[in-house]
């Protein structure tokens, strides 16, 4: 598979349609759990989760009293989330999206790059949590994604960004993201702090075939600006 094949929405729709979703976790992400207390949470906190899939992390936020806004391309993923977790919902149709609305959670079925178009329909969010969106995109789209998120985030948006860093350039997602890249793409408005870096114990065989010998989980935080 070459880079161009991961550049389009059909790639991800096919992954969901074929249940090729090994990136889905059965428990909340360990780095979210570890660093959640670093976020400033209150009764009105709302978290935006781009490319949310059917992530169990959404339940973690809900369990902490945080309302959730998800953006997801695959309607199958959204339906799976609500059915697997027996959450009631209503469906609302918009011009650029289809909204699945439950108690304290809204998931918009839409292309992530349509986010600026639907931003006015979203509740105001004070947290942006990104576990798999940024690293799911090849380099050119990551640059565009960063520009878009700079548009929709405010000075008070708290950000917990989970990425991966490899010793070889990835040909498939998740892609390697360095601190230097984040500075380049976000420094105009957002300053990230590296708060965690953990080496992966077992590198997948397909990564070894690419020549990879080291892989790290890295976590970045941007706190609320007072």
UniProtKB/Swiss-Prot annotation:
Signal peptide: none annotated. Its EC number is 2.1.1.67. InterPro entries: SAM-dependent_MTases_sf, Thiopurine_S-MeTrfase, TPMT. S-adenosyl-L-methionine binds at residues 16, 51, 72, 131. GO terms for cellular component: cytoplasm. It catalyses: S-adenosyl-L-methionine + a thiopurine = S-adenosyl-L-homocysteine + a thiopurine S-methylether. This is Thiopurine S-methyltransferase. It comes from Francisella tularensis subsp. tularensis (strain SCHU S4 / Schu 4). PANTHER family: THIOPURINE S-METHYLTRANSFERASE (PTHR10259:SF11). Belongs to the class I-like SAM-binding methyltransferase superfamily. TPMT family. Its main location: cytoplasm. Keywords: Cytoplasm, Methyltransferase, S-adenosyl-L-methionine, Transferase. The gene is tpm. PROSITE patterns: SAM_MT_TPMT.
């Amino acid at each position: 598979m070459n880079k161009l094949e991961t550049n389009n929405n059909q790639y991800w729709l096919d992954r969901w349609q074929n249940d090729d979703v090994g990136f889905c976790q059965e428990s909340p992400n360990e780095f979210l759990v570890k660093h959640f207390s670093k976020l400033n949470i209150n009764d009105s906190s709302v978290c935006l989760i781009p490319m949310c899939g059917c992530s169990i992390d959404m339940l973690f936020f809900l369990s902490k009293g945080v309302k959730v806004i998800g953006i997801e391309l695959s309607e199958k993923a959204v339906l799976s989330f609500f059915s697997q977790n027996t959450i009631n919902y209503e469906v609302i149709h918009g011009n650029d999206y289809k909204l699945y609305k439950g108690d304290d959670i809204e998931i918009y079925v839409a292309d992530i790059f349509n986010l600026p178009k639907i931003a006015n329909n979203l509740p105001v969010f004070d947290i942006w949590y990104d576990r798999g969106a940024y690293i799911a995109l090849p380099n050119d789209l990551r640059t565009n994604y960063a520009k878009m998120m700079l548009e929709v985030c405010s000075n008070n948006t708290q950000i917990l960004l989970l990425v991966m860093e490899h010793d070889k350039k990835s040909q498939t997602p998740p892609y390697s993201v360095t601190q230097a890249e984040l500075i380049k793409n976000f420094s105009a408005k957002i300053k990230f702090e590296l708060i965690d870096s953990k080496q992966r114990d077992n590198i997948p065989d397909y990564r070894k075939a690419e020549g990879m010998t080291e892989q790290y989980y890295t976590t970045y935080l941007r706190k609320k600006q007072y």
